[in-house]
Structure formats: C-alpha cells, structure tokens
Amino acid sequence: MNICKMAQEVHENARNHGWWDEDRSFGTIAALICSEWAEALEEHRAGRPNVWFACEEATESGTFICAPKDEFDCLEYDNIENCKHRSKKPEGVAVELIDGCIRILDWFGRENIRIAGPNTIEKLIRQAGHSYDNMELPDIVAWLNLFVSRAFFEHRRNITNGNKDSARKDACGHLLEALAVAFSYVANTGNDPEELLRMKHEYNKTRSYRHNNKVC
C-alpha cells in the first residue's frame, strides 16, 4: 500500500464527511491523533482483544464482544461474519492504533505530502526495526505520544519563524516515526496493518456526516 495514495483516499473521505469544512490547526490534528492512542490504551486496560466486533443482539447494558466458541454460544457461529447482529464497526487495541494512523494520513493528504523515503507500510515497519518489538502497549502509546508531540513542537516553532515548508517537512518526519511504530506493533499482534487500515477506512465511509455533529 502506497502511503501517499492512501493518504489522498483518507483525506477525500474526511472532506466528504465535513471534517475540513473549516480549516483545522495542527494542534487540533495532533490532539486528535493522541486521542486515538489514548483509546487504544483504554481498550488495553479493559482487557479487550486487538480486533473485535460488538454483538448488537444483547439487550443488557455493557459491551458484548461477538466471539462465540461454538454453535451453543451462538446459532450464527458458522456464519458469524454475515450475522445481522454483528456490528460492522471494527474495534480493539489494534484498531484504535490504526485510527491514529488514519488521522495522520488525513493530514498528509490535506498537505499533499510526498514521501521521499519509505513510502509503504512494509517499508515503514522495516524502518522501525526491532527496538519496539517487546514493549507493552502502554510504553508504545508513550512513544507514539512523544512522536506526535515532537511533530507539534517542530511545526509550531517553524510556523512562528515563518518557515511553513520546514514546518510541514519536520512534522511529517516525526509523524512517519509514529506510523512506523504503530504499524509495527499491530503487525506484531498477528494482524495485518494494511488489512485493518483498509477495513476501518471502508467502515469510515459509511459513517454519518461529522459523526453526528461532532465539533472536531
């Protein structure tokens, strides 16, 4: 998957859903990216899987994960992916990390970023190396927040000094680090980051305009 091409697809969908009806500051973008990392941490704290779908048939309050062990758990066991009660929305630790990546790609698309170095998910994962392989999710989230904070700092510093091109370039560099680590972590969970990215992007296409009038 070419990162720049996917960024344009993601940004087009964001525009179609009203997220760029008014321009947004880079600070807002950075905060929203970090909010996705925080949601990944909350999924981890709740002990939920990396990828899951809700069962919408359950009437009791709470979260019910669609994960039947056999036909005695659910009559739709053999047809689970087509079950009408299975939510279409992918959720979980890995999915929330992918959501953060989608927000980064949205900004890349907005700024028409062109990547000179590693420009595919596979290449970014190789760039991340093995330094993060044995880290727990909370440590990964801390690193991801650091990369985004660095991007925000460099962007603001350069904009303040009137260097718009440098602002984009420096912020992009740090956000690519975040993408590399997030994709690498997802891959190490046994999930395909490209497949998850495509899955969540396709779901996002079906969502309501501005997700029921969120302000940002």
Please place each PLM-identified region on the residue numbering.
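Flexible "arm" and connector segments at domain edges
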Residues: 1-216
